[in-house]
């Protein structure tokens, strides 16, 4: 053994020499093919897609896309020459595949002349790096295609969140004839050559950053470069994609001891530092910037950041992240610098220090050559620049100032006024009175009660301090003591009637409590209706008990003019409890299953809600309890606005025709030509802007589907986002459609899928609930207002919370006053959307509730509470199956144009002829509705004008009813003996019918009438 070692060493050196010689030759070919992009000043969004040849074989984008179904996105073009009568040819494919589980996918050989599949195929050697295959050249000489990632193309739409992980790849099959195999084994095989590797379209291309280096190439670099980590500075034009391997570009170019970038004035310039933990894991990686200097001119290091290690969160708070890189893994560190608009042109030099635990500091000199040209938008319009990464740290709209229609707050003694809401506080800091619209919500002051071994303890006396922090924020702080227990209460009261409470409860020593109870008593009026904590919604039951089982953390008690929404807080996630986001309940309130909430009291009497923790232990350090209140309605219902805005919800090509029937607002959904991918409406720009400009000529508005919950794989910054290690992209098992498997590889969670034209697809990823992507999303909204002149957005079940909605509305008022937000939800997905989204309602213009709303099964009180939006200050439209056009008008609701079996246009025509925009809406739910019916299942809503009245009748029962109407003629301003009651003809709704005052009116089950009452002519 000792004698053999020198021979082994010599052999290894020989191998290394040969490998390096091959690599050098490949580098020359690589440089030859990419000479047009060798100068960094010319790098752009096309650079990474230029042909390259890491093994002397070019990787290119095909000049014509082939059919993806059964073939896939990648192929090798193989040339067979001089086959003569050979029954088998052999070809080596250095494909450098990044996908996992390559041996689980079929290798498909297709005859280029006949397009027929070659069945006699034998795989001799196979790995991620390369394969050696033998196949029968059935047409002898010619071109053959080897599809090495074939899959079944998925049609239509689907959702990868549910069920087993998707695997659309074709599995390996052995169809080769045994006699043919025997001939191959006898060696009757000739060589074929690989002309090139092709990607079906540019988006599918692996790029030099997506193909793996071989193990030998990695070992070579490890032998040459002994430092750990090995560092690869990289321009933003070549996003770092891989994490399990280094890319072929790095294997060819090797690491660099410096970085040179090229920027324009006012550009937000980004670049990357690739960290390869080649020899050992790297812990706590930190980048330290220096100033950039050009003589006396300086760009301060304060203008630089590394997005992976620091930033400003969605709530405006600064944070730092710890970056660790496991052994043999790759981590991209994305960096950015704001180039001042007035900076002198020239070359600015500085350095980056790379710190990590247990490793020497590495210093990378950097220089950025700055051109005199000014980039007006900082680079936001050129997605490839990744300038928008700075949006991740934006604080846009984050302040404590009121936004329309809300006003500045005032405070006098213990009374706080938030626009039309008045809150009075007890000495202990809890509300003693909440009034809105002349209605009192609380029958008694709210209070906290401790049940101890020695009886009950309440907190009444304290030192209350109320401070106006800003025009839109008032805080109230109180400390109460009783029998040795201390209660510290801090309330943040905002301009829209939102109140956030933080309570800290302490004992002088560790003390066992029987219970901690928060008690609220609501007036009879303000507790008629109820929803939340496991109750779907409607008239309040005499008693409802909830023990924290199920995805709920809030409830609402109220009526049309006064109500209160209550949310238990204490966890990290405070957005709507969607199927994607079901955090554990707040620990202090749920108390390991011992907590419960009880709502009790006979209908039309006071209602008491008691949140009880059950037995718990109190310590000198204290227990924390949090909750939110929101006074409803958040704002007055604007019926004029509602009836003057009529929605079309279908492909944009039909909008002009729908406008002839009254539609004046379009929502452009995703998966449409002008908005093809989900939640990233930045790819199609020119045609979208042209469409918006066209509609503006006719005073029509254009809104886009734009939300947060999932994000398309077409996002330009997707690899930068993945480098943030689940801050933004949720963790998961991977899989999903082939593109995700081939480019993101693993460690992501697939979501919504939509087929796009030409066998392409939009494959979304689930996002983490709260992250800096919210900041990006809001800046994207601002950008669309400024660049598209967009008129608003359509939100579909989102995962952010009320503070984000505040920021959104402030952005609207600053950059596009009058822009609109409408919210759609799926009651099977968000489990009671009206309750889940109550905190959004001060800032929403309209609801579209919604999917899985089964209108014909809902009682009137369910319609009112869960659908109408009216108790919260807005109105809604019907979605599921077009809703019920008869019952909907009781709440002022129709379906949207082109969404449902019946057009709303005939009802819109009646609105127009009657002038409903200027009418006062008085629903059956109001105490003074001037038209009543004789049957509890038949409801009447009045649209009152000075000289005439429109009455919407709806029979919510399951059988036909005959009813009489009882009129308050004085309030209607009409005389009974001088009026006529007419049901005008409305297509698909009713035929013309005349009724006399006092006459019985038949109303079919689940149908109704639209009656106009006016003086006889």
Please report, for each region that a protein language model flagged, where it lies by residue.
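Alpha-mannosidase-like glycoside hydrolase catalytic domains involved in N-glycan trimming
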Residues: 43-226, 231-249, 255, 260-343
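Carbohydrate-binding surface patches
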Residues: 60-97, 564-566, 932-974
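C-terminal beta-strand-rich structural cap/linker in extracellular carbohydrate-active enzymes
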Residues: 139-152, 992-1017
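An acidic-aromatic substrate-binding cleft motif
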Residues: 162-189, 367-430, 626-681, 685, ...
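Beta-strand/loop-rich accessory regions of lumenal/periplasmic or secreted enzymes
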Residues: 183-199, 315-324, 334-341, 372-622, ...
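Active-site-proximal substrate-binding groove within the catalytic cores of carbohydrate-active enzymes
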Residues: 620-621, 809-812, 816-983, 1007-1010
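Active-site-adjacent "subsite" loops/lids of carbohydrate-active enzymes
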Residues: 704, 708-783, 788
